[in-house]
Amino acid sequence: MRCFRTKGYDEVSVNDICGEADIARSTFYRAFSNKKDVIRYRFEHTDANQIVSIEELLAARNDFDRMWVIGDRYISLCCELGPTFCAAMMNLTLAGEIDMLQVAHSVDAWFVRLTRNCQQTGIIRSHEPPELLGPLFVDLEYQTLYEWCRSQGEYPVRAQARRRAEMLANLAPEYRWSKEQLENADKM
């Protein structure tokens, strides 16, 4: 994955992947047909249950922040891979070759439960059904990542994702991030 991050998806060849992994091309071709298969494998083996530690979830101060911890983990993965690579994954999704959204929506059941809890405690003031609202948080984050890719990484992806999620939820003011937190969100 490192060579995708440094060179970008389009510029990486199978030779580059083999050189980075220190394997023969024949070894590569026993597992994969092409570089798209590497991306497909990476996304098919990304699971929400593996992406966030229980410690991170327990440390969050409320259920909305737990949703943020989960969502931010996906943002972090995309930021680690870079906007060019992330954009290539989005293009492969549009072409029907991988399904980034399926992986992202693997957290929907969690988001529905956490949204319901937040509505019951008054953290989320939106009265939309949790079954509709929970998955919308994922869609909104995906759209925010799209903007980040489009700007070649020159877009405050974390601050915008957090602010948009707060607005979608009609989050109670005491749970919203401060201006300072938003300004520092992308310096992580």
Language-model regions, residue ranges each:
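Amphipathic alpha-helical packing segments from all-alpha helical-bundle domains
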Residues: A48-I51, G96-I123, E131-D139, Y146, ...
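Generic hydrophobic, amphipathic alpha-helix propensity
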Residues: M1, I17, R42-T46, Q50, ...
